[in-house]
């Protein structure tokens, strides 16, 4: 997530580090939040473009303002949405794809609290752009379920918190691995 880096320069360093680890394409998430003193969004967008990133997952506020610069750089834009109406708006403004986040997601689940078993089929009925399922996805079984519900793929987020690459304290990682289905709080 781009905003976990305190400055665009730090994001550029992380993009370069990722580039050193793979010759495959990768994406960056950039969340646009309402703020009295917003982050340096133009700088973050420039770091993404200059870093040769191939895909950006935007989240939060409407990304329309940033689409021309990103698309002119050949970057695919996937907007994260927690409702079908927001997904349709993302499609209408020109996003290439949508990440449909059910209530099960580890981040902000939106205001409507719609679980994936309801949200994904509705998105499949309405959207013309590809979409991936997000929220509660963890393995191949999740992928099969997401595909059956109409998505073209899935996002995993929390699942990767326990990896050696994640800059998270080992106690937190161990707690995640040891957790049962009863330890999730929505």
Which residues fall in each region the model found?
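Active-site entrance/lid segments in N-terminal catalytic domains of soluble metabolic enzymes
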Residues: 1-127
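Conserved active-site-proximal phosphate/metal-binding subdomains
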Residues: 110-132, 138-186
């Amino acid at each position: 997530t781009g905003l976990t880096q305190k400055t665009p320069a730090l994001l550029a360093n992380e993009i370069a580090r990722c580039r050193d680890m793979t010759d495959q394409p990768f994406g960056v998430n950039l969340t646009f939040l309402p703020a009295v003193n917003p982050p340096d969004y133009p700088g973050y967008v420039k770091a993404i473009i200059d870093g040769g990133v191939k895909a950006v997952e935007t989240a939060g506020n409407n990304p329309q303002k940033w689409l021309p610069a990103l698309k002119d750089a050949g970057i695919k834009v996937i907007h994260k949405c927690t409702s079908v109406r927001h997904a349709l708006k993302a499609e209408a403004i020109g996003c290439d794809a949508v990440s449909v986040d059910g209530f099960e997601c580890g981040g902000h689940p939106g205001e409507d609290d719609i679980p994936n078993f309801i949200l994904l089929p509705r998105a499949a009925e309405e959207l013309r752009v590809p979409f991936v399922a997000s929220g509660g996805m963890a393995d191949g079984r999740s992928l099969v379920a997401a595909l059956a519900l109409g998505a073209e793929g899935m996002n995993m987020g929390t699942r990767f918190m326990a990896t050696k690459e994640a800059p998270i304290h080992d106690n937190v990682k161990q707690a995640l691995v040891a957790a049962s289905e009863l330890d999730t709080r929505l």
